[in-house]
From Swiss-Prot:
The lineage of its organism: Bacteria, Bacillati, Actinomycetota, Actinomycetes, Mycobacteriales. Residues 1-22 are annotated as: Disordered. The gene is rpsO. Part of the 30S ribosomal subunit. Forms a bridge to the 50S subunit in the 70S ribosome, contacting the 23S rRNA. Transmembrane segments: none annotated. InterPro entries: Ribosomal_uS15, Ribosomal_uS15_bac-type, uS15_NS1_RNA-bd_sf. Belongs to the universal ribosomal protein uS15 family. GO terms for biological process: translation. This is Small ribosomal subunit protein uS15. SUPFAM superfamilies: S15/NS1 RNA-binding domain (SSF47060). GO terms for cellular component: cytosolic small ribosomal subunit. It comes from Corynebacterium jeikeium (strain K411). One of the primary rRNA binding proteins, it binds directly to 16S rRNA where it helps nucleate assembly of the platform of the 30S subunit by binding and bridging several RNA helices of the 16S rRNA. GO terms for molecular function: rRNA binding; structural constituent of ribosome. Residues 1-21 have a biased composition (Basic and acidic residues).
Amino acid sequence: MALSKEQKTETLKEFGLHETDTGSPEAQIALLTVRIRQLTEHLKYHKHDHHSRRGLLLLVGRRKGLLKYLAENNVDRYRSLIERLGLRR
């Protein structure tokens, strides 16, 4: 369920601070969100795939921590990001 190179590059161009940015919280959160959405779709059809469900929960927890970090350090960037990603918060 990994992201293809094209998906990753496109996501980083849209949400990264620059084209090759992979370390900023925005870029990491965006990549995690894309992976979470892919796994969510997978689990709709494979309800008994508990190993993938656990992986999904780990990704959600990692994203939650990064969102908390961003909210504490720069509220404007946080609000902009959740609006662009369409996250509920």
